Amino acid sequence: MKAVSPVRPSGRKAPSGCGGGELALRCLAEHGHSLGGSAAAAAAAAAARCKAAEAAADEPALCLQCDMNDCYSRLRRLVPTIPPNKKVSKVEILQHVIDYILDLQLALETHPALLRQPPPPAPPHHPAGTCPAAPPRTPLTALNTDPAGAVNKQGDSILCR
């Protein structure tokens, strides 16, 4: 996952610190569809953090820390195995994320629709410089046949890219 943060050339200072309050708001507005109803609160919080970082002398480091803390809080909201009302460290958040990804991978590997398909044949050897044709993919509609199992809340989309 890549963080959704503005990238600026190193050695150049942002016009108004931490990417600027306007830039943080624009960045959040671009991804507002995935923030659900808390878009205004998240935008205000990000702008406040960026304005606080603006006053500090070590601006680039604080901007990076601001971006990283935003991504950790997004991960905390997105991963369902993290207890919502318990303080967890960044390492614990990453451990929960890794476990959640492994659980999702296992669920994909053991999905009944995928088990019914015969294994793909071994790809033939192609000479260097040529690309083999991609194997056909299983349509998502075939995998998502259980509507009761697919619960999609408005705030459940990935924010960091």
Curated annotation (Swiss-Prot):
InterPro entries: bHLH_dom, DNA-bd_prot-inh, HLH_DNA-bd_sf. It comes from the Eukaryota. Residues 117-126 have a biased composition (Pro residues). GO terms for molecular function: protein dimerization activity; RNA polymerase II-specific DNA-binding transcription factor binding; transcription corepressor activity; transcription regulator inhibitor activity. Residues 117-161 are annotated as: Disordered. It comes from Homo sapiens (Human). Disulfide bonds: none annotated. The gene is ID4. Heterodimer with other HLH proteins. Transcriptional regulator (lacking a basic DNA binding domain) which negatively regulates the basic helix-loop-helix (bHLH) transcription factors by forming heterodimers and inhibiting their DNA binding and transcriptional activity. Implicated in regulating a variety of cellular processes, including cellular growth, senescence, differentiation, apoptosis, angiogenesis, and neoplastic transformation. Keywords: Nucleus, Repressor, Transcription, Transcription regulation. SUPFAM superfamilies: HLH, helix-loop-helix DNA-binding domain. One of its GO terms (biological process) is prostate gland stromal morphogenesis. It is found in: Nucleus. Residues 52-104 form the bHLH domain. GO terms for cellular component: cytoplasm; nucleoplasm; nucleus. Its main location: nucleus. This is DNA-binding protein inhibitor ID-4.
